[in-house]
């Protein structure tokens, strides 16, 4: 695991954009051979990105060969019938911990988990096993963010707002959630449906520690769809 301090990471990502570079098997940029995601990372870094969020052991290993930017790592793996799939069990945490990345992000919603644990207990177990690893909670509502902080999480992400059955469905960032968490003194990494620089600028003014932008930069299919829809 990476030994970077929380303070050092905050300084490194301050006032910048962390770019999420991912492609899942059903998406156009995914290849079995790999090699595509590191190219997105190089483009993001040349464009001024201050960090990268990435999925899977393979992609993260390839990314580390082309950049020294800090990485927020996840492993997306389905565990039906339960809904959580972002670093959903200790198995995924173990795999990520071996990669020497700055932050591991995990699903910290209140939904039923495959391992049967309450989220606070899962966080406790992760921190006990990897006490020096920085952790980010992917959450969907205010209460989940607070619960994660109380359990010892370093950063709270708004990643899953709109993606749980009980969170607001809006076509854009959950400004209200981001601001409420910041006002409560939480170290927030804003993420989710941030489509424009103007939205990112507004979010920065709330006092977030970091901002993750994904689809608006690295998913050309989604970008095209938004333009096509905008012409109708």
Curated annotation (Swiss-Prot):
<comment type="pathway">
    <text>Amino-sugar metabolism; N-acetylneuraminate degradation; D-fructose 6-phosphate from N-acetylneuraminate: step 3/5.</text>
</comment>
<dbReference type="InterPro" id="IPR013785">
    <property type="entry name" value="Aldolase_TIM"/>
</dbReference>
<dbReference type="GO" id="GO:0047465">
    <property type="term" value="F:N-acylglucosamine-6-phosphate 2-epimerase activity"/>
</dbReference>
<dbReference type="InterPro" id="IPR007260">
    <property type="entry name" value="NanE"/>
</dbReference>
<dbReference type="Pfam" id="PF04131">
    <property type="entry name" value="NanE"/>
</dbReference>
<keyword id="KW-0413">Isomerase</keyword>
<dbReference type="GO" id="GO:0005975">
    <property type="term" value="P:carbohydrate metabolic process"/>
</dbReference>
<comment type="function">
    <text>Converts N-acetylmannosamine-6-phosphate (ManNAc-6-P) to N-acetylglucosamine-6-phosphate (GlcNAc-6-P).</text>
</comment>
<dbReference type="GO" id="GO:0006053">
    <property type="term" value="P:N-acetylmannosamine catabolic process"/>
</dbReference>
<keyword id="KW-0119">Carbohydrate metabolism</keyword>
<dbReference type="InterPro" id="IPR011060">
    <property type="entry name" value="RibuloseP-bd_barrel"/>
</dbReference>
<protein>
    <recommendedName>
        <fullName>Putative N-acetylmannosamine-6-phosphate 2-epimerase 1</fullName>
        <ecNumber>5.1.3.9</ecNumber>
    </recommendedName>
</protein>
<dbReference type="GO" id="GO:0005829">
    <property type="term" value="C:cytosol"/>
</dbReference>
<comment type="similarity">
    <text>Belongs to the NanE family.</text>
</comment>
<dbReference type="GO" id="GO:0019262">
    <property type="term" value="P:N-acetylneuraminate catabolic process"/>
</dbReference>
